[in-house]
Amino acid sequence: LIRVNILNARSKNQAKKIAFSIANSPLVKTAVAGEDANWGRVIMAIGKTEENINQNKVKVLFGSNIVCENGSISKKINIEKLNNYMKNKTIEINVKLYMGKFYQTVYGNDLTYEYLKINADYRS
């Protein structure tokens, strides 16, 4: 299970649009399935919304693990702690935009090889 929390958005609509873009991204889903805290894929999902944000203010966390802040990789990453976190059944992706007071939480699922294989082999 993936829980995406968008915080400090300019509007409720902006928060919702970005949250769903992250939760529905096949690249984010496969990264989570592979236990990879790939913050670049999160940033890509934000960017494809074409929402006007300040990329130099964005902070991305997996759980409480800061992976990106001020538009670049965080110097505070604890790889061991982050890798352990990514083994959890529920992964929380927190994005702080620092643009306003609005927030949105959405849920999604990962995308595993097993899921793809089952559905690729399925015939109706």
Which residues make up each language-model segment?
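Short glycine-rich or small-residue beta-strand-to-loop segments that form or flank ligand, phosphate
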Residues: 1-8
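Internal helix-turn-beta structural module
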Residues: 8, 13-124
